[in-house]
Amino acid sequence: LQVVDTPAGRLGVLVCADSWFPENYRALAGKEVDLLAVPAFLTGNGSWEKPWGGYNGAATPADVQLKAGELSEGDAWQTMAMAGRINQSGAQAGITVFMRGQLWDMGSSGHSLIADQAGHQLADDDHGARLINKWL
């Protein structure tokens, strides 16, 4: 797992689905990260609102009791990925940013979100470029 020293602190990076697994957060805690960044891509227009498809063939972590289809993809990203696991890393804050737009013919979905030890906040789902800040 990559950790980069920045002026704001030690930044841990989890790419997309890596953010769904608790062992990655334990590893980042061992590297004493202060911040997390999760670049992500959710395939298909409107996928955020559709039923969650589960862990797509990977072993489901022991702390996940939900089964595929029991919540939306968006709710799953908010509970079982970085926003729901940031406390396991020791980081003060984190951000998940979804690539949006048309990649080949796949379309995309997702709401970027910012999290800290107290909870998380979704970014608006407006179209176009944006800047998302977390004041530390």
Q: Where in the sequence are the language-model features?
A:
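A short, polar/charged loop-to-alpha-helix boundary motif
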Residues: 1, 129-136
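Extracellular structured ligand-interaction cores
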Residues: 1, 16, 109
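Beta-strand-turn-beta hairpins that frame and shape the catalytic cleft
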Residues: 2-12, 35
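Hydrophobic, structured segments
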Residues: 12-14, 58
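CN hydrolase (nitrilase-like) catalytic-core segments centered on the catalytic cysteine
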Residues: 19-132
